[in-house]
Amino acid sequence: MQQFKIWLSAARLRTLPLSISGILVGNALCLNQPNFSWVLFVLMLFIAISFQIISNFANDYGDGIKGTDNENRVGPKRVLQQGLLSKEVLKNGIIFMSLVALILACTLIFLAFESQSWLYIIVFIGLSIFSVWAAISYTVGDKAYGYRGLGDLFVLLFFGGVSVLGAYFIQLKTLSFPAFYLALSIGFFSVGVLNLNNMRDQANDAAVGKKTMVVFLGAKRAKMYHIILMVLAIILFVGVFLSNIILFFGYHF
């Protein structure tokens, strides 16, 4: 039971709702369509959670072995930092969750496309592999992109674009402008969450050479950057919502 609690701590359960936000929005856009699949929707939720757990394990591992998670770090203590799991055990956890995520992703892809289009199958399998790489490479490796100020871009891409547009396309086999705008909105909200965490960790990140966007910008500009992200996210989200209301009443009246 104690070991299970340690793995739950490493999985960072409070981060999981954010990981499924794009999936929820992408599928919500498809709910009124006759070919909407609840099976595909549930699979997408499990896949998104799996990718987030991979990222959390890898984040713990990468920051731990680089010394970023040290006694000066503000925020919750990590399992590797506390010695609750060894590097080897945590690495095995990353490998295991990567296999789980890829198996679930392949199941989703073949259920969604069957033999309709091998091009779509190949593209989405490639995207799944890339997603695993991105989840791990944020902090792991000599060229970890989270240490080069690229974390914000990847969060926008995966939490927004891949999550919302991927969910929408898997359900309907097409794309739309509302889906694109909402993908940007969810992406900006997600980058905002990352930015808040990086603002909290700014001093320690700068000291250990982790060049996040906040470290590049400085505290004052990072706050302005955060306001811009939130304003854009809200405008896009509300804009899509209001346009749908206008279309609804215009159609019925």
Residue ranges of predicted features:
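Intramembrane alpha-helical segments
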Residues: 76-78, 82-174
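Topogenic membrane-insertion module of multi-pass membrane proteins
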Residues: 1-39, 43, 47, 138-146, ...
